[in-house]
Amino acid sequence: MRKRELAAFFAHAAHETTNGGPGAAGGRYAWGLFYTEELGCADGHCKVYNTGGTSPYKPAPGKSYYGRGPLQLSYAYNYGLAGAEMGLPLLANPELVSHDGVIAFKAALWFWMRTQAPKPSCHDAICGKWEPTTEDRRSKRTPGFGMTINIINGGIECKSNDPAIKENRGDRIGFYRRFAGLLGTTVEPDCDCADMAPYGN
């Protein structure tokens, strides 16, 4: 199970930061950890992430909370909560997640391990420690890699039939299978979230 979890974490990190494509040397799944920030969000773009939602963590003036680091930590409420729990000024200085490798991985591991109800943590979902509620079962949310997709980006990727979105999910799954093979472990038969309802829907 530990190897499967490592494969899952590496798969999402590689997908979120890759610079590889179908014609890349070694194949698309040989790439990852290239980009440290979400593309197209510099210079004040991607304001959609500048929300604290109902959390106490509101955006700092002049700062932007787009995806940064191996798992592309996004939204002011995630930067604020991660910073508070790790003792780092991430709400005031979100760029630390892309400029400091140690902080980048701390933030990624924080997100991976942190339950944010009603979502379980990625760790619990992939390790089988999460027990789906009646609502989760009704929404076809089950433990495994597909559930980690749902936790990370389910609102966009799960239950979508858009070809580009399906390709994104397939890319995550391709990385997962590659890393599982490299680590000498297997993956579950259904790694997708195609039938799962995302949270909030």
Language model regions located:
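Sequence contexts marking disulfide-bonded cysteines in secreted/extracellular proteins
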Residues: 40-47, 123-128, 157-159, 190-194
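Short alpha-helical "patches" and their helix-cap loops
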Residues: 25-36, 90, 120-135, 164-174
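Short, well-ordered loop/turn and helix-capping segments at boundaries between secondary-structure elements
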Residues: 79, 114-118, 182-185
